[in-house]
Curated annotation (Swiss-Prot):
Paired cysteines (S-S): C28-C42, C35-C47, C41-C51, C46-C55
Protein name in the entry: Conotoxin Vt11.3
Keywords per UniProt: Amidation, Cleavage on pair of basic residues, Disulfide bond, Secreted, Signal, Toxin
Key word Transmembrane present: no
InterPro entries noted in UniProt: Conotoxin-I_CS (IPR013141), Conotoxin_I2 (IPR020242)
Organism of provenance: Conus planorbis
Keyword Ion transport: no
Tissue: Expressed by the venom duct.
Compartments, record wording: Secreted
Length: 74
């Protein structure tokens, strides 16, 4: 009888844990959705109030001016 109660308890615990896992993943936001924090997004990246794979910094281009100035001083 004890074995039956233990296995039923484990089975119910497994169902509860699976439901928690499904609910946790269902609450995340897809790419392009509005966000305030990274944990709200499925990919854990909130950039400029939108869920995204990576952040782009408009207006900041990668220039080698600093490197060229460094080599020019030598």
């Amino acid at each position: 009888m004890m074995f039956r109660l233990t296995s039923v308890g484990c089975f119910l615990l497994a169902i509860v844990l699976l439901n928690v896992a499904v609910l946790t993943n269902a609450s995340c936001r897809n790419e392009g959705a509005m966000c305030s924090f990274g944990f709200q997004c499925c990919k854990k990246k909130c950039c400029m109030s939108h869920c995204t794979d990576f952040c782009r910094n408009p207006g900041k281009r990668a220039h080698g001016h600093g490197l060229l100035r460094f080599w020019g001083q030598r």
